[in-house]
Amino acid sequence: NITLNFYIMNYTVQNLTQVADCDVLLSWAQKEKADLTFRKLSVERLTDRYAETSVEVATQLQGVIAELAAVDSYIAILPDGPIKDEAVDKKTRLEYKKFLLEGRVESYGVVALLEKQMDLGRVEQEIAEVDAFVAAVEARKAAL
């Protein structure tokens, strides 16, 4: 795990002169945080799904590649005839399955998983920023 330090903005809350303005901002921030919390939950679930799927797809792809190698060597020693034709058909089906799995690797593989993890980190930073904003506004409200 990597911990990232990020910049929290210094808000100009000293310009707030009325408690009502603080209340409006706090209400808005609550809604923002609720939206971000929901988004975080969605991204967490999606990230978990990508993690599971990426391992599953990689395993399936390795199995198909191994099976293709075996079928290739089997075809090479077979004489022409119906058994060889059947093996060639099986090879064609395996190549298509490999093609589909390679497409899934692009969609759900390690790169896609890392993109989802980055999305999750970004949402977590946005939530931290909203929390900092709320703390600044609440401190100003208390001072008014």
Regions found by a protein language model. Give the residues of each.
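Short, Lys/Arg-enriched N-terminal segments with co-localized hydrophobic residues
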Residues: 1-8
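Short, charge-rich amphipathic alpha-helices with coiled-coil/heptad character
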Residues: 8-50
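Amphipathic, well-ordered alpha-helical segments in soluble domains
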Residues: 32-35, 39, 67, 97, ...
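Surface-exposed polar/charged interaction patches
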Residues: 35, 74-81, 97, 104, ...
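Long, charged amphipathic alpha-helices with heptad-repeat/coiled-coil character
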Residues: 36-54, 102-141
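Extended alpha-helical coiled-coil "stalk/arm" regions
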Residues: 46-95
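Long, amphipathic, charge-rich alpha-helical segments that form helical bundles/coiled-coils
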Residues: 88-110
